[in-house]
């Protein structure tokens, strides 16, 4: 038979982590001012009212650079623990990391060849 012994702290944590946001949102709803007119409807950013419209089109190059950055940033997140435990992992982990790095180098070469890293 399945026993829940030892899970009391986990269950307590789940209950508290669910109750805290509910309590915070309920308290905010009860004590917040109800008025939705005038100054509350204005946009406020960095202490100044914005000038002009907010709907402008950004150049696609910004998104391409951001996407390439995120891909290689995630690569670093995956490779760091491997590098820390390199001596304990053995040859198989080394080969797996080489395959991972090879895939990313191929992706970088593809992005470079397609011009994703060119600004012009």
UniProtKB/Swiss-Prot annotation:
Source organism per UniProt: Prochlorococcus marinus (strain NATL2A)
GO cellular component: NADH dehydrogenase complex; plasma membrane-derived thylakoid membrane
GO molecular function: NADH dehydrogenase (ubiquinone) activity; quinone binding
Intracellular or extracellular location(s): Cellular thylakoid membrane
Classification via InterPro entries: NAD(P)H_OxRDtase_bac/plastid, NADH_UbQ/plastoQ_OxRdtase_su3, NDAH_ubi_oxred_su3_sf
Protein name stated in the entry: NAD(P)H-quinone oxidoreductase subunit 3
Catalytic activity annotation: a plastoquinone + NADH + (n+1) H(+)(in) = a plastoquinol + NAD(+) + n H(+)(out); a plastoquinone + NADPH + (n+1) H(+)(in) = a plastoquinol + NADP(+) + n H(+)(out)
E.C. number(s) listed in UniProt: 7.1.1.-
HAMAP family referenced in this protein's UniProt entry, alphabetically: NDH1_NuoA (MF_01394)
The keyword Transmembrane helix is assigned to this record: yes
Quaternary structure and interacting proteins, as annotated: NDH-1 can be composed of about 15 different subunits; different subcomplexes with different compositions have been identified which probably have different functions.
Gene: ndhC
TM regions (residue ranges): 6-26, 64-84, 89-109
PANTHER family, alphabetized: NADH-UBIQUINONE OXIDOREDUCTASE CHAIN 3
Mode of membrane association: Multi-pass membrane protein
Reported function: NDH-1 shuttles electrons from an unknown electron donor, via FMN and iron-sulfur (Fe-S) centers, to quinones in the respiratory and/or the photosynthetic chain. The immediate electron acceptor for the enzyme in this species is believed to be plastoquinone. Couples the redox reaction to proton translocation, and thus conserves the redox energy in a proton gradient. Cyanobacterial NDH-1 also plays a role in inorganic carbon-concentration.
Cytoplasm as UniProt keyword: no
GO BP, sorted A to Z: photosynthesis, light reaction
Keywords linked to the UniProt accession: Membrane, NAD, NADP, Plastoquinone, Quinone, Thylakoid, Translocase, Transmembrane, Transmembrane helix, Transport
